[in-house]
Amino acid sequence: MNATSSTPGAGAERLEQDWRTFARLLGQAYDDELHVPLLQLMLTPDEREALATRIRIIQALLAGDVSQRELKNELGTGIATITRGSNSLKSAPPELKRWLIQQLRDTPL
């Protein structure tokens, strides 16, 4: 048994700490212009593709001009993937949604 499984909540706390460490490291990598090699190191090609798909899903949902089913067909992904993106977007803070709209508005789908 590992240390995180013997203490309820400890695993979740560690996961959150590790996530924040990654976010801080990524921010520093951007400052140092090392973000692309860092992301290539940290993410497999499939994970990078999944992130790119999630961005396209969020962009299309924010634009609101296609249904989830149409988006599924356009992206060639499962409806569950579209639904997860939609649910994440629904729970995002309003300021993040505004920022995303501004950042993604001129990016082609």
UniProtKB/Swiss-Prot annotation:
Organism: Sodalis glossinidius (strain morsitans)
Any GO MF annotation of the entry: DNA-binding transcription factor activity
Keyword tags: Cytoplasm, DNA-binding, Repressor, Transcription, Transcription regulation
Chief location: cytoplasm
Keyword presence, NADP: no
DNA-binding region per UniProt: 68-91
Free-text function comment from the UniProt entry: This protein is an aporepressor. When complexed with L-tryptophan it binds the operator region of the trp operon (5'-ACTAGT-'3') and prevents the initiation of transcription. The complex also regulates trp repressor biosynthesis by binding to its regulatory region.
UniProt cross-references to Pfam families, sorted A to Z: Trp_repressor
UniProt GO cellular component terms: cytoplasm
An annotated GO BP: negative regulation of DNA-templated transcription
InterPro entries, per database record: Trp_repress (IPR000831), Trp_repress_bac (IPR013335), Trp_repressor/repl_initiator (IPR010921), TrpR-like_sf (IPR038116)
UniProt name for this protein: Trp operon repressor
Family label: Belongs to the TrpR family.
Complex formation: Homodimer.
Domain of life: Bacteria
Subcellular location: Cytoplasm
Chain coiled-coil ranges: none
Keyword Transcription: yes
